[in-house]
Amino acid sequence: MGEVSAIVLAASQAAEEGGESSNFLIPNGTFFVVLAIFLVVLAVIGTFVVPPILKVLRERDAMVAKTLADNKKSDEQFAAAQADYDEAMTEARVQASSLRDNARADGRKVIEDARVRAEQQVASTLQTAHEQLKRERDAVELDLRAHVGTMSATLASRILGVDLTASAATR
């Protein structure tokens, strides 16, 4: 490029030395040389530099669009999963509440059954004890009635100091 500038500069100096007057409205050769160089550089950049950059930008835009679509899809899946989770938790809470209420009812029933059995056992034990005490009382009463004579004679002999056993035994 340095040579082209030198040539353009030399041509402009030669034109001035030749005595020509330059009109700024009429383009000279330098303008066309610079224009040609600009167009060549523009064509090279447009042909070799811009298409790969545009390709990379399009790929980036496609990747960003895909990422946005994936994010949207993920958000929808998360919302659906959250809704399923909330529904499952609500159902589980209802089921747990039902099981808890059933367990409480069963517990009350078991306690009531145990209480009824205990009351029956107590009543049965009291009845058995009452019957046993009655039998023992009757047995003791019969025993006492059978031995009342000998016991009274022994007691009287202890109190009086006289042996009444022989006379009581004869009776």
Swiss-Prot record:
Domain of life, per lineage: Bacteria
- The signal peptide stretch is none
Q: Which gene encodes it?
A: atpF
Q: Which Pfam families match?
A: ATP-synt_B
* Principal subcellular localization: membrane
Q: What family does this chain come from, according to its entry?
A: Belongs to the ATPase B chain family.
Instruction: Give the record's membrane topology.
Output: Single-pass membrane protein
Q: What is this protein called?
A: ATP synthase subunit b
- CDD domains recorded for this chain? ATP-synt_Fo_b
**Function noted in UniProt:** F(1)F(0) ATP synthase produces ATP from ADP in the presence of a proton or sodium gradient. F-type ATPases consist of two structural domains, F(1) containing the extramembraneous catalytic core and F(0) containing the membrane proton channel, linked together by a central stalk and a peripheral stalk. During catalysis, ATP synthesis in the catalytic domain of F(1) is coupled via a rotary mechanism of the central stalk subunits to proton translocation. Component of the F(0) channel, it forms part of the peripheral stalk, linking F(1) to F(0).
Q: How does it assemble?
A: F-type ATPases have 2 components, F(1) - the catalytic core - and F(0) - the membrane proton channel. F(1) has five subunits: alpha(3), beta(3), gamma(1), delta(1), epsilon(1). F(0) has three main subunits: a(1), b(2) and c(10-14). The alpha and beta chains form an alternating ring which encloses part of the gamma chain. F(1) is attached to F(0) by a central stalk formed by the gamma and epsilon chains, while a peripheral stalk is formed by the delta and b chains.
Give the UniProt subcellular location, in the record's own words: Cell membrane
Native source species: Mycobacterium tuberculosis (strain ATCC 25618 / H37Rv)
Q: Does the keyword Ion transport apply?
A: yes
GO MF, one term, reads:
proton-transporting ATP synthase activity, rotational mechanism
> So where does this one cross the membrane?
31-51
Q: Write the record's keywords in alphabetical order, separated by commas.
A: ATP synthesis, Cell membrane, CF(0), Hydrogen ion transport, Ion transport, Membrane, Transmembrane, Transmembrane helix, Transport
Instruction: Please indicate if the UniProt record lists Ion transport as a keyword.
Output: yes
Q: Which GO terms describe its cellular component?
A: peptidoglycan-based cell wall; plasma membrane; proton-transporting ATP synthase complex
Q: Per its UniProt record, what InterPro entries does this chain match?
A: ATP_synth_B-like_membr_sf, ATP_synth_b/b'su_bac/chlpt, ATP_synthase_B_chain
